[in-house]
Amino acid sequence: MTQEPFREELAYDRMPTLERGRQDPASYAPDAKPSDLQLSKRLPPCFSHKTWVFSVLMGSCLLVTSGFSLYLGNVFPAEMDYLRCAAGSCIPSAIVSFTVSRRNANVIPNFQILFVSTFAVTTTCLIWFGCKLVLNPSAININFNLILLLLLELLMAATVIIAARSSEEDCKKKKGSMSDSANILDEVPFPARVLKSYSVVEVIAGISAVLGGIIALNVDDSVSGPHLSVTFFWILVACFPSAIASHVAAECPSKCLVEVLIAISSLTSPLLFTASGYLSFSIMRIVEMFKDYPPAIKPSYDVLLLLLLLVLLLQAGLNTGTAIQCVRFKVSARLQGASWDTQNGPQERLAGEVARSPLKEFDKEKAWRAVVVQMAQ
């Protein structure tokens, strides 16, 4: 009987100070359960088998058709220049299709501008073919080239229709039941360093391509063609706005800037690939130049065209990568519960953090009252 008070006192001393005032310790529940503290890859993915199959199939068909079109357009460089342009414009759509197939979300609607701009380029190439056929019917052999051109047009039309009919509502419904676990995840990081590096390389590549285009225009007036003027124009249009938008979005990311950057990159990427496809005939000329040894000095004009082609490909790849990075950030922000429609300020974010842990604030107050009572006793 005499040892019972000492046992109670010993047990009371072992109890933490902040836990003494709790009336019902068993009813305490932590804010985050171990099952909730999981990485995003452990969350049930918003996966669509139809989207995956469509993306892989469409990307494969576009790559194969574009490859055959580029080869045939380089075999007949003067007669099938429209085929090279159409094939080049479809390359970013193929890249985006494979990127979509690797994601666990339906991100096809976010590339709608890119698909529409590519479809506009292929339609223009089809009209170009019709005009050449009307002006000189005997010079054009309607054969496999028309089949490839129509196939590219149909593939892009199907992509545009599917992208227009796709939506992210199903994905949002699947993610709706996971809002509690998504709130504890960290905010989605914006790829600022990647976009800044892209913008620097884009400016350097654009200036180099502009200087190369000016030099190529002044090499020989007899060999200068309209393709150089068109390429020169699209370099000026595509390079600097995209680089400036990338740098500004990396400095202060917001919904408006990300959407503008996606739109600019989606518009300029197919156009740059179109110009690259048109200039791809310089590769065959360089190969023919090195067949005979020693190579002739006169075809140095083709070397400039090849360098211009490489810079255009670099610029087009950076624009496509920018669009993919921005869409990836946008989709990740939506799926992880971050606010995309409205930008939260610091006060709203702090209020949200306090609202997430009401039990902690309540327990601290009760514990402080318990400490005051014990000190008074």
UniProtKB/Swiss-Prot annotation:
One of its GO terms (cellular component) is caveola. Residues 1-36 are annotated as: Disordered. Residues 1-23 have a biased composition (Basic and acidic residues). It is a multi-pass membrane protein. Changing S246R: In MLC1; does not affect subcellular location. The chain crosses the membrane at residues 52-72, 82-100, 111-131, 144-164, 199-219, 230-250, 257-277, 304-324. It comes from the Eukaryota. One of its GO terms (molecular function) is protein-containing complex binding. Keywords: Cell membrane, Cytoplasm, Disease variant, Endoplasmic reticulum, Membrane, Phosphoprotein, Transmembrane, Transmembrane helix. Interacts with ATP1B1. Part of a complex containing ATP1B1, TRPV4, AQP4 and HEPACAM. Transmembrane protein mainly expressed in brain astrocytes that may play a role in transport across the blood-brain and brain-cerebrospinal fluid barriers. Regulates the response of astrocytes to hypo-osmosis by promoting calcium influx. May function as regulatory protein of membrane protein complexes such as ion channels. It is linked to Megalencephalic leukoencephalopathy with subcortical cysts 1: A syndrome of cerebral leukoencephalopathy and megalencephaly characterized by ataxia, spasticity, seizures, delay in motor development and mild intellectual disability. The brain appears swollen on magnetic resonance imaging, with diffuse white-matter abnormalities and the invariable presence of subcortical cysts in frontal and temporal lobes. This is Membrane protein MLC1.
